[in-house]
Amino acid sequence: MSPRITLNDGNSIPQVGLGVWQTPAEDTERAVAAALQAGYRHIDTAAAYRNETETGRAIANSGVPREDIFLVTKLWNSDQGYDATLAAFDASVQRLGVDYLDLYLIHWPVPENNKFVDTFKAFAHLRDQGRIRSIGVSNFEPEHLTTLIEETGIVPAVNQIELHPLLPQQELRDVHAKLGIATEAWSPLGQGSLLADPVITGIAEQHGKTPAQVLIRWHIQLGNIVIPKSVNPERIASNFDVFDFELSGQDITSIASLETGKRLGPDPRTFNFTG
């Protein structure tokens, strides 16, 4: 089983989960079922992924009790604002076929719209009603976090950000540590760009592990929550087989040399897409 990270609200989240970003709806149900069978208990989806229905169906048919699964989804940009958020939440849980979420995230800050504070107030209302266990954000930069906390008085439990050895986000992780926010990594494998890197493949050979397992282990040892994605049942199981080895200090130093500081995804400060 995955180790768990205790969040600032007292809830705990499995450190390794399955992400279903860019997973076609027709593949999602099979992938989530394979993950739950392999021992995963943390599933991460989003309204924008258009696969909440299939995610929920796999959970319902898995035989795993709902209370044993940490289920995460995200509010899309066009649904920000207090009332719109309440409606979007209802739509998400209906698609998922559940009556509560373990974690709900604001997908992007969309700073141009300036609605993320009211959105988070709606999240807090839903949490107070018992419909969400933990509330958090995704792709928030330090200035967005500062505004959110100052305006609402609530520190998000999680900030899910692009994070991999090319973009280790040390500065933002330091901010999280000071504020008590858990760091969660999306694109944890660098969208596959690191799997053939000689540094990673060399470390993998030394440990008798795959490059993906080395990268996931790197996240675990940094304290990140990590949600690798795959639709291949064997790879899904392999990505979860990361708890029986440890990277050395030299391994960590070698991986640090890969940093470029370049994003593979959009810049949250300028990404204002609401389509």
From Swiss-Prot:
Keyword Phosphoprotein set for record: no
Keyword Repressor in record: no
Positions annotated as active site in the UniProt record: 49 (proton donor)
EC number: 1.1.1.-
Pfam family for this entry, one: Aldo_ket_red
Top enzyme category: oxidoreductase
Domain of life according to the entry: Bacteria
Covalent link (Isoglutamyl lysine isopeptide (Lys-Gln) (interchain with Q-Cter in protein Pup)) residue numbers: 262
Molecular function terms from GO: aldo-keto reductase (NADPH) activity
Keywords: Isopeptide bond, NADP, Oxidoreductase, Ubl conjugation
InterPro entries: AKR, Aldo/ket_reductase_CS, NADP_OxRdtase_dom, NADP_OxRdtase_dom_sf
Binding locations of NADPH: 189, 227, 229-231, 235, 238-239
SS bond partners: none
Listed PANTHER family: 2,5-DIKETO-D-GLUCONIC ACID REDUCTASE, NADP-DEPENDENT OXIDOREDUCTASE DOMAIN-CONTAINING PROTEIN
Family recorded in the similarity comment: Belongs to the aldo/keto reductase family.
Protein name, per record: Aldo-keto reductase MSMEG_2408/MSMEI_2347
